[in-house]
């Protein structure tokens, strides 16, 4: 439609998005294809609540409560983000896939980021794409850069990557352990046989998890 204004000709219509594709937004780090080889799937936060929540009367002291009310837990449910996702796709074709990588990483790693409008994301009890940045995403993360004191398991995970992130590890360029070996900041974790209820493998002390 054309609107005539003195000395101005204004064209009004649907905006035309930039002709981009998923490849234009490719970032290094662990890829969805790598997840196919994952020995252990990314569990939802529901599997964590049984032990890490609902055991104290003052629940704000519990790890579960500290996560469930923060922005990480809501990153894939936030209506403002969903509105921004729509705008991103209107501006550049399939650019929303890049947004999903950070805001709904479980869904992204499970291969549910296309269509890039988030319509393929699934809400399940054991695997929930709407979990946001959940417990598994953080506690299975591997330091992208080797530093003194790194657990020995990290070297093998980094070496197996097809697209290592190098020194620039922002923008969702996470590296995830394909095995459910949880990492954390504490060095006094009981690791006797049968003590790790998450996995047959021991929990891992990770200096990477001592800084945010």
Regions inferred by a protein language model and the residue ranges of each:
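Short beta-strand-alpha-helix junction that forms the catalytic/metal-binding core
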Residues: 134-135
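Sequence context of c-type cytochrome heme-c attachment sites
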Residues: 12-45, 49-131, 140-211
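Sec-dependent, cleavable N-terminal signal peptides
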Residues: 1-15
């Amino acid at each position: 439609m054309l609107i005539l204004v003195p000395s101005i000709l204004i064209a009004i219509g649907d905006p035309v998005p930039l002709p981009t594709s998923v490849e234009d937004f490719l970032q290094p780090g662990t890829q969805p294809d790598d997840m196919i080889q994952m020995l252990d799937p990314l569990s939802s936060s529901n599997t964590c609540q049984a032990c890490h929540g609902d055991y104290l009367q003052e629940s704000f002291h519990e790890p579960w409560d500290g996560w469930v009310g923060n922005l990480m837990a809501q990153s894939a449910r936030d209506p403002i983000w969903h509105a921004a996702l729509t705008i991103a796709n209107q501006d550049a074709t399939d650019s929303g896939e890049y947004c999903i990588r950070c805001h709904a990483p479980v869904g992204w790693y499970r291969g549910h980021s296309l269509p890039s409008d988030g319509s393929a994301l699934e809400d399940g009890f054991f695997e929930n794409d709407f979990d946001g940045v959940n417990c598994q995403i953080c506690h299975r993360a591997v330091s992208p850069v080797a530093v003194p004191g790194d657990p020995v398991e990290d070297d093998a995970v980094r070496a197996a990557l097809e697209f290592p992130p190098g020194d620039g590890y922002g923008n969702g360029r996470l590296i995830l352990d394909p095995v459910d070996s949880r990492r954390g900041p504490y060095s006094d974790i009981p690791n006797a046989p049968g003590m790790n209820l998450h996995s047959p493998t021991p929990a891992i002390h990770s200096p990477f998890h001592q800084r945010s």
